[in-house]
Amino acid sequence: MIDKSVFIHPTAIVEDGAVIGANAHIGPFCIVGPQVEIGEGTVLKSHVVVNGQTKIGRDNEIYQFASIGEVNQDLKYAGEPTRVEIGDRNRIRESVTIHRGTVQGGGLTKVGSDNLLMINAHVAHDCTVGNRCILANNATLAGHVSVDDFAIIGGMTAVHQFCIIGAHVMVGGCSGVAQDVPPYVIAQGNHATPFGVNIEGLKRRGFSREGLVAIRNAYKLLYRSGKTLDEAKLEIAELAEKHPEVKAFTEFFERSTRGPIR
């Protein structure tokens, strides 16, 4: 079903079965597959390809040569009906690629809302990107990566498969991330190592002075105390009982499979 208010350029191809919401815009030379859903007000600028079982929300801006929902690059993939879901108000810039999931990884690649994916960023199969994240130019997520809310990944940075990038993290450009990055941390290098707490970012997001002190204390326990990881986890858990901001660390430890960067 295509709403009557949708603009479709004469050179675009929208296949039968596609669902496009009110006031969407399908620009020149775009291709929209038969299983695609596009929400109200979303704009495909030009030369955008969206195919597979892909659902895109409202008011997104998708720029030329982006490819969304294409067959993933996992050699085990055998054409199973896997999906891509994208939320609302994202800006997906030129030549971004977002691949469909695999059955081994849950079958879904998911991007939340209010994100900025800059030129040539890549989101591989089974990745989850939260809300209000930034992937700078040429940032690359391998399969099964999780990027939590408000994270920023610098240009030319590559993230190893199955890694977690915690909430409010900033990863510097040209880095190689091979382990999980705890929330609030600045990471840089190849392999990426911790360089302190993302204090300026947290201030901009309204964290209290007390909360910032607690986060710094958790960081010091993890990286500067000389304690083993297990010892640091126990003390951080105690700190989290008094300071809710620190709970992000304990939740991160529960999810982490590759271990935190050191």
From Swiss-Prot:
GO terms for cellular component: cytoplasm; membrane. The keyword rRNA-binding does not apply. Pathway: Glycolipid biosynthesis; lipid IV(A) biosynthesis; lipid IV(A) from (3R)-3-hydroxytetradecanoyl-[acyl-carrier-protein] and UDP-N-acetyl-alpha-D-glucosamine: step 1/6. SUPFAM superfamilies: Trimeric LpxA-like enzymes. GO terms for molecular function: acyl-[acyl-carrier-protein]-UDP-N-acetylglucosamine O-acyltransferase activity. Its EC number is 2.3.1.129. Keywords: Acyltransferase, Cytoplasm, Lipid A biosynthesis, Lipid biosynthesis, Lipid metabolism, Repeat, Transferase. One of its GO terms (biological process) is lipid A biosynthetic process. Pfam families: Acetyltransf_11, Hexapep. InterPro entries: Acetyltransf_C, Acetyltransf_C_sf, Hexapep, Hexapep_transf_CS, Lipid_A_LpxA, Trimer_LpxA-like_sf. It comes from the Bacteria. Gene3D superfamilies: Hexapeptide repeat proteins, Udp N-acetylglucosamine O-acyltransferase, C-terminal domain. The keyword Transmembrane does not apply. It is an enzyme of class 2 (transferase). Involved in the biosynthesis of lipid A, a phosphorylated glycolipid that anchors the lipopolysaccharide to the outer membrane of the cell. Homotrimer. PANTHER family: ACYL-[ACYL-CARRIER-PROTEIN]--UDP-N-ACETYLGLUCOSAMINE O-ACYLTRANSFERASE, ACYL-[ACYL-CARRIER-PROTEIN]--UDP-N-ACETYLGLUCOSAMINE O-ACYLTRANSFERASE, MITOCHONDRIAL-RELATED. This is Acyl-[acyl-carrier-protein]--UDP-N-acetylglucosamine O-acyltransferase.
